[in-house]
């Protein structure tokens, strides 16, 4: 059992979902194979804690879908963020595998985050003295 933001986090034998939050308790599916995947699941559940109001189990409801997405975006920004992409580049990561390893997230989580950033920012965005390119491939360029 661990505590994050005053929440209790436990591994449980969940059915279906890999993570669940109720009040101040987060359950992570016990048989999730890696710590990286568990960390990504925990990040999304923390996103629900910070952004979700009420019960959103019914994802047929548009409002619930929006809240689910908002929690996921919180997780992307918390675990990766644009500055995380820059830090990984500065560390020497030049492919998704090494970047995901450096950021301690799964490749799938990183891929989904980049897809979100591409949709939000388009082909590229500027952050401090860097340009992050999302198309045609992920790339970071330091401005001098």
Residue ranges and their predicted role:
Residues 1-41, 46-144:
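Active-site hotspot residues in diverse enzymes, especially metal/ion-binding acidic/histidine motifs
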């Amino acid at each position: 059992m661990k505590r994050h933001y005053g929440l209790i986090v436990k591994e449980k034998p969940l059915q279906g979902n890999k993570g669940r939050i109720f009040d101040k308790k987060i359950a992570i599916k016990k048989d999730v194979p890696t710590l990286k995947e568990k960390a990504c699941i925990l990040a999304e559940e923390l996103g629900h804690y910070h952004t979700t109001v009420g019960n959103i189990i019914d994802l047929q409801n548009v409002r619930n879908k929006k809240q689910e997405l908002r929690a996921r975006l919180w997780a992307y920004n918390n675990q990766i963020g644009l500055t995380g992409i820059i830090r990984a580049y500065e560390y020497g990561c030049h492919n998704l595998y090494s970047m995901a390893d450096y950021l301690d997230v799964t490749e799938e989580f990183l891929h989904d985050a980049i897809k979100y950033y591409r949709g939000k920012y388009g082909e590229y965005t500027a952050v401090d003295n860097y340009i992050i390119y999302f198309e045609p491939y992920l790339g970071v360029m330091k401005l001098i």
